[in-house]
Amino acid sequence: MRSMNRGTDWTAISEDLTSGGKQGNVAYGTLTSIDESKFQFGLLYTGSDDGKVFVSQNSGSDWQNISATLPKDLWVSRVVASMHEKQRVYVTLNGYRWDDFTPYVYMSDNYGASWTNISNNLPLAAVNVIREDPANPSILYLGTDNGAYTSFDNGASWNPFYEGLPNVAVHDLTIQARDKHLLLGTHGRSIYKADISLLQGII
């Protein structure tokens, strides 16, 4: 759904972008993540709880399934349009529902036509969120059930980011660009803030 008047009116801009609901007490057929590119109005990405990822490049008039080569039937924990490259998009998937703790992290540089696995040296832990650094395009931040990680080479390798952080799942990340702060939302252990100004200077 889309509203152009702050929520007063809503218009459907898609058909069902999932595989459809299933019987039982565990929700299926639900969109879990949506993002719009800052480079183009109407360049939209969605992810669902049954592993479907779709892209629309015309404000929802047409949608393309871009998840055919991704692992099947996993929870799309985050889909993120790049703030540095128009065609780049990231997807993280979570397999906890199947007792699968593999870290699933993918990047595409062609609107999702093909994907590169960038989980590399991450330990076994479900991945909940990925963010780009707003100042340094080589830096990525990741929140997992095993804590936070950062990459200085676009996901080729990952480093633990744990100083001052308890051993806890990180469910969300956001960056306050002006003050150069990374904010981490954890599972029951409050919100943490980290100064990332020194990290942003690493090339």
Predicted regions and their residues:
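Beta-propeller blade termini and top-face loops
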Residues: 1-203
